[in-house]
Amino acid sequence: MPLHIDAVILAGGMARRMGGDDKGLVELNGQPMIKHTIDRIKPQVKEILINANRNQTRYAEFGFKVISDEHSGFLGPLAGMLAALGQTKADYLLTVPCDSPQLPMDLVERMLNAIETKGADMAVASNGEQEQPVVLLMKPSLRDSMEAFLKAGDRKILLWYAKQNYAVATFADQPNAFMNINTLEEKQQFALDQT
């Protein structure tokens, strides 16, 4: 029986570096940035959730369930991950940011392979030089650990997953796959690079 893998696209942040604009809805090459992410991960998972704390109606137009953080106050990506872990019945949950339009088409396959090779509970993606802490594949059983971490007042993903049994899935062959678009300048540069 094949594994059931769901994904959550994290679009719940404040987007300070994007001038406060909701990053997932910012146009990139003629379509909202989140649409690029959806197109990359949809073939790899069973269901997609979108974590958003504003503009939920607009996000719902993409045809996926929209969930908000369980805790108020824009507590960062872990809060969105926690909300998704409470919604999924999957064997694994993939977490990705809404502002990475070039995610690998073999992301889930390679992350799952890293988990199985190490016997880990989760995997974090790496571009070969640094880990990408928002790009995780994890077992939903990690929810209690994540919730306790947040309740203790911690928010840094790196500190949380460092306490877990995790593997690293390396994508050195795709070094630009995890490029984030955080500013209007980066958006303009990405558009130029695509022409």
Swiss-Prot record:
E.C. designation(s): 2.7.7.77
Subcellular location, record wording: Cytoplasm
Binding site residues for GTP: L10, A11, G12, K23, N51, D69, D99
Cofactor requirements of the protein: Mg(2+)
Keyword Aminoacyl-tRNA synthetase found: no
GO molecular function list: GTP binding; metal ion binding; molybdenum cofactor guanylyltransferase activity
Pfam families found in the cross-reference section: NTP_transf_3
Function, as annotated: Transfers a GMP moiety from GTP to Mo-molybdopterin (Mo-MPT) cofactor (Moco or molybdenum cofactor) to form Mo-molybdopterin guanine dinucleotide (Mo-MGD) cofactor.
This protein's domain notes: The N-terminal domain determines nucleotide recognition and specific binding, while the C-terminal domain determines the specific binding to the target protein.
Identification of the protein by name: Molybdenum cofactor guanylyltransferase
Lineage, highest ranks first: Bacteria, Pseudomonadati, Pseudomonadota, Gammaproteobacteria, Alteromonadales
Gene assigned in the entry: mobA
